[in-house]
Amino acid sequence: MKKLRLSILILAISAFFSQSFACTSILVTRKASKNGSTMITYAADSHTRYGDLYYLPGGVHKPGEMIQIFDYGDGRPLIQIPQVERTFTVIRNANEVGLGITETTFGGRAELESETPAIDYGSLIRLALQRASNAREAIKVM
């Protein structure tokens, strides 16, 4: 009983002081699932980000068109970048061709934060899903 109480106490303390505000992902490959499906889950475990399910319609875009990049956390405008000719429809962490991206991050060390950020991880995920049809293309986009 004493060991159980100690274990629970250690677990509680480590959860409080660890990077417990990181996001959680569960990945299942087709060889690991019973029916051959690939599955991903994503939970933004932060107390400030509650589940959202955004929809970004794909389409064909005009040459010279620009898109505004916003901070994923607070929504402030960051930079504008050129739009590509064709984008895929995105619903949260997956696109219309079946590419899915999830992440496990935490706030990070304060001294590494840029005072003039241009793009953040949430925007990178969205751009990759809009512009890539597979993981290799997504890496190139990022």
Predicted regions located by residue number:
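Bacterial N-terminal signal peptides
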Residues: 7-16
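A contiguous strand-loop segment
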Residues: 24-121, 132, 141-142
